[in-house]
């Protein structure tokens, strides 16, 4: 399965000698396979993927099958 769970990371680069602040948004992937599988009441949360439970935030997250993306692996991917 392709790991499509994406976190947004903000990176700040300061060029103080020019008094310019550059802010860029980058996509960061998380290794969901390190998290436990979702409990039975959430086993169908991911439409086309595998549900993992993020214990630190108490939320489910999906590892999408190839060809799918989105929070619940519900969107076809053209990648």
Swiss-Prot record:
Gene Ontology cellular component terms for the protein in this record: extracellular space
Keywords per UniProt: Disulfide bond, EGF-like domain, Neurotoxin, Secreted, Signal, Toxin
Spans traversing the lipid bilayer: none
Molecular function in Gene Ontology: epidermal growth factor receptor binding; growth factor activity; toxin activity
Top-rank taxon: Eukaryota
UniProt GO BP: epidermal growth factor receptor signaling pathway; positive regulation of cell population proliferation; positive regulation of mitotic nuclear division
Annotated family: Belongs to the EGF domain peptide family.
Name the UniProt record assigns to this protein: OMEGA-myrmeciitoxin(02)-Mc1a
Lineage: Eukaryota, Metazoa, Ecdysozoa, Arthropoda, Hexapoda
